A protein has these predicted regions:
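Elongated, amphipathic alpha-helical interaction scaffolds
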Residues: 1-212, 216
Length: 217
């Protein structure tokens, strides 16, 4: 009887400790349905305060082909900001050899899809691809976060800010430090593996706390 009771107690504890991980595709998409979660994460990526992100709207995630033989693109999450800038988020758990080519395809398609025939190029707004990787894509350094832009090869001068790629490599996260930047805190949240880790981070960031509440429901 005591052994049966012990087993039942353990099963109850396991159920209470269970939590869906953000690296699971479905969980990540559900997280981004929450406007406050989007606000916090986007602010961290753009280096601003959440209050500065006035509005975010989810867009359809299918990039339709222009011609019958063209390839479709299917994004995880696509968002438009109040200023018209667009961001697409992709959670990629396993390494694939064509990842770089695929994100360039998605980014280019997202940029060109802004215009219809006859519309002015002046209407084009900034497009940002955010790749959240649960594997190491750049093996030659230990930088876990990087922003890639168009720039002059010789001078390093930025050519345009209309296209950006943000790469978050969760496997490269260093040991925790004091006063970490917002994007590093979000990366820790996205890569966490237990309820205990989530709860600890939630105490340090209001928007991460909202994320924990959302995935716990």
């Amino acid at each position: 009887m005591n052994e049966q009771k012990k087993t039942m107690t353990q099963e109850t504890q396991n159920r209470e400790d269970f939590i869906m991980l953000p690296t699971v595709d479905f969980c990540f998409k559900e997280l981004m349905q929450n406007a406050k979660v989007r606000q916090g994460m986007i602010a961290a990526l753009l280096g601003g305060e959440p209050e500065e992100i006035e509005e975010t709207i989810l867009l359809p995630t299918i990039l339709h082909p222009e011609y019958p033989d063209d390839k479709y693109g299917i994004l995880d999450v696509k968002v438009v900001l109040k200023n018209g800038s667009q961001m697409d988020f992709e959670m990629q758990v396993t390494a694939v050899s064509y990842w770089t080519k695929r994100i360039l395809f998605y980014l280019g398609k997202m940029y060109t899809d802004q215009l219809k025939a006859g519309e002015s190029y002046e209407k084009l707004k900034k497009c940002i691809h955010v790749g959240i990787l649960n594997f190491i894509h750049f093996p030659d350094d230990d930088r876990c976060y990087r922003k890639i832009i168009f720039c002059d090869k010789d001078t390093g001068e930025e050519y345009t800010d209309l296209l950006e790629i943000h790469v978050l490599e969760l496997k490269k996260l260093p040991e925790k430090e004091q006063n970490e930047s917002g994007i590093i805190r979000w990366m820790r949240f996205l890569g966490a593996k237990s309820r205990k880790e989530f709860e600890k981070m939630a105490k340090e960031d209001t928007y991460i706390d909202l994320s924990l509440i959302h995935i716990s429901e």
